[in-house]
Amino acid sequence: KDMKECKSITFIPGSFEDLDKVKRYVSTDVEWFKEIGIDLEEVNILDDNTEEDVMIDNIKNADIIFIMGGDTQRQNLFLERYKLKKMIKEANGIVIGVSAGAINLGGISLCSRDPDDGVNETITYRGIERIDYTIEPHFDLNNLDLLNNELYPISNNIKIYGLPNDTGVRITNADYDIIKGDFYLIYKNGVEKL
């Protein structure tokens, strides 16, 4: 409902090697927005070939900033290198984070161990700071190894919100609305379904 008037979107990929693939994902997302009544007139994709002043302009003028999935740590380094974190943190428009993008929205971001995806150890690092907790996308409540050995120890210091696949959550300031799916709080060695 609050996106109906949006006309411009800026995408920030989580993978930069295959820009044709990124463009296909962007095209799919733009089509999805159109299907729900959001007709975007300006679509921008940031990458290493985008001039810095153009990046800044695209972020500042975007009605929607869409931080895509992909390589979480590489995306974080991209945001740091071009000094985009503060701009995204302070943006007045809508910010959407998917998978890696959701992780990077946190003040303290958590990239959990996933050997299948080339992440051999769980790390925490400074994220965008748009939200004051961290998101664990693709969360599987039955993955006890991840819960017991990775997430529970970290949950003593930070709140982790676990979002299983196909979950959508709308966050406004400190409030959230579950759009679809389940939403879990992992904190102080426990898991609570919200």
What are these regions (language model features)?
Residues 1-5, 11-27, 32, 111-194:
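C-terminal and late-domain segments of enzyme folds
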Residues 5, 37-39, 61, 156:
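Short loop/turn motifs at secondary-structure junctions
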Residues 8-15, 40-46:
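A short beta-strand-loop structural module common to alpha/beta enzyme folds
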Residues 10, 64-68, 96-97, 135:
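Structural motif
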Residues 24-46:
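Extended, compositionally biased flexible segments
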Residues 41-94:
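Flexible gly/pro-rich beta->alpha loop and the following alpha-helix that scaffold active-site loops
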Residues 42, 96-98, 161-163:
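A structural signal for short, well-ordered beta-strand segments and their strand-loop junctions
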Residues 74-78, 82-141:
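Class I SAM-dependent methyltransferase SAM-binding "motif I" and its flanking Rossmann-like core
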